[in-house]
């Protein structure tokens, strides 16, 4: 057993450990912690063990305790350690009471940060996290480094710990839900931007901003910070930086960071030297927002990997699933899956990547974020708007109240289901048109997450005759 794994074993052996929820990462850890000698309690809103489906058999086999139903948080009392799932609000009173009573409240990601023996690169922001995180991991891989990729991007990190060597690198996508309670920061920290998001979950915008700042606050020099220059909030984070802070910017030149030069070259300026490293025309990724993601990723790894690795990946990488992902061309109409568009800013970035007006399918779960900024972009870039979900009426109101709506010729329709939305969009399309699913909303009214939503859209589109 490696030193780090041994330290984790010493932390949990003989301890009373509560897990909030049985998501994918917690299922793996529950089994591991039982094996390490912990007394595990699973706290969950489900009413009975049978409600866990196929996992019920594992629960019975492991012999773990259960605290279920309406009062599942009663199981927090008397625990030595509580593992919080990111979706569980950190400032809920039962959890804060447990902290006051001396319980260690942590999470899978926090434990990984505590015991990881290798360098960690962390990426957060309201938009661009996953593409930037993926690019960074591919830059390191192209340079021959072994990469452990995880966090909010999908894979649990702590189970990887036995395979992590000091010379490796961990590349971690971090959400505000994960960051809000973290007390360690990565060696290299990237903040892409901060715009209103998840305000259904956070108390207010300031709590959301403070959660994002946590990626910087616990860094120990030597360290590196990469901040988006175009965003007022990320620019305000400079006083939080403890190491070598650099910018990335598409719209300005800088003598300290990565930027898009007027001649179409992506450049890095550092220590008085400007190095052009990639031509915009050679980039396969669609959209100007992806130029920003490339700049952010390059600024993060600059000096850590050869320029040739950045050039190779930058000129061949075609994107991540659900991000302006081409699905199919049918009857001369191209369908795109941009289900990652869970906020207005994401959808705006997607719309701006098209050079003609599109047919947009939008709407979903309401995160209580404003839609007024979306309205002028819809009027400028959309010819037919198909709305669904709880935010459909809010998006329609914002668009219809915009002074340019009356003269725009924009048509608005409403759909009850994704199938219905695709049918309406198809009926409105002419050869040469593009139909894009970019909801500007979360998925939770109809789907567990944006991935499931995007895959249903693709399935429906691919089954069209």
Feature roles, as predicted:
Residues 56-57, 374-432:
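C-terminal helical cap/extension that packs against the catalytic core
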Residues 8-16, 26-36, 146, 277-384:
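Nucleotide phosphate-binding/pyrophosphate-handling subdomain across enzymes
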Residues 40-44, 149, 171, 247, ...:
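Short beta-strand "acidic-cap" motif of Rossmann-like dinucleotide-binding folds
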Residues 39-47, 225-229, 361-362, 381-390:
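Short internal beta-strands
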Residues 33, 82, 123, 152, ...:
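Residue-level signal for inorganic ion chemistry
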Residues 35, 73-77, 86-229, 233-242, ...:
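Phosphate-binding loop of NTP-binding sites
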């Amino acid at each position: 057993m490696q030193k780090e794994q041994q330290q984790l074993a010493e932390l949990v052996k003989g301890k009373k450990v509560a897990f909030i929820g049985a998501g994918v990462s917690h299922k793996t850890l529950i089994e591991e912690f039982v094996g390490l000698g912990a007394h595990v309690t699973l706290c969950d809103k489900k009413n009975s063990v049978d409600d866990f489906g196929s996992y019920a058999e594992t629960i019975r086999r492991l012999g773990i305790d259960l605290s279920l139903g309406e009062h599942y948080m009663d199981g927090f009392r008397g625990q030595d350690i509580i593992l919080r799932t990111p979706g569980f609000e950190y400032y809920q009173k039962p959890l804060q009471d447990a902290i006051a009573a001396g319980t260690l409240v942590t999470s899978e990601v926090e434990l990984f940060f505590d015991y990881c023996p290798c360098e960690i690169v962390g990426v957060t922001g309201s938009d661009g996290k996953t593409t930037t995180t993926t690019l960074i991991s591919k830059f390191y891989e192209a340079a021959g480094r072994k990469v452990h990729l995880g966090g909010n991007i999908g894979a649990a990190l702590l189970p990887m710990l036995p395979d992590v060597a000091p010379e490796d690198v961990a590349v971690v996508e971090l959400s505000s839900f994960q960051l809000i309670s973290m007390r360690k920061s990565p060696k290299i920290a990237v903040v892409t931007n901060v715009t209103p998001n998840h305000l259904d979950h956070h108390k207010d915008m300031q709590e959301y901003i403070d959660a994002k700042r946590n990626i910087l606050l616990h860094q120990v020099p030597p360290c590196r910070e990469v901040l988006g220059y175009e965003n007022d909030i990320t620019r305000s984070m400079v006083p939080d930086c403890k190491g070598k802070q650099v910018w990335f910017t598409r719209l300005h030149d800088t003598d300290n960071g990565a930027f898009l030069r007027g001649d179409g070259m992506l450049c890095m300026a550092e220590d008085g030297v400007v190095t052009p490293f990639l031509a915009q025309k050679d980039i396969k990724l669609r959209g100007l927002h992806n130029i920003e993601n490339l700049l952010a990723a390059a600024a993060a790894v600059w000096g850590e990997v050869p320029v040739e690795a950045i050039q190779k990946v930058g000129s061949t990488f075609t994107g991540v699933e659900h991000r302006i992902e081409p699905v199919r061309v049918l009857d001369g109409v191209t369908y795109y899956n941009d289900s990652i568009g869970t906020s207005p800013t994401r959808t705006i970035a997607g719309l701006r990547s098209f050079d003609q007006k599109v047919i947009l399918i939008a709407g979903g779960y309401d995160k209580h974020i404003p839609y007024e900024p979306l309205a002028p972009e819809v009027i400028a870039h959309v010819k037919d708007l198909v709305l669904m979900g709880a935010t459909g009426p809010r998006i329609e109101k914002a668009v219809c109240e915009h002074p340019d709506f009356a003269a725009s010729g924009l048509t608005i329709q409403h759909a009850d289901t994704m199938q219905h939305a695709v049918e309406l969009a198809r009926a409105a399309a002419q050869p040469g048109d593009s139909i894009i699913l970019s909801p500007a909303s979360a998925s939770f009214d109809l789907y567990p997450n944006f991935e499931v939503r995007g895959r249903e859209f693709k399935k429906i589109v691919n089954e069209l005759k």
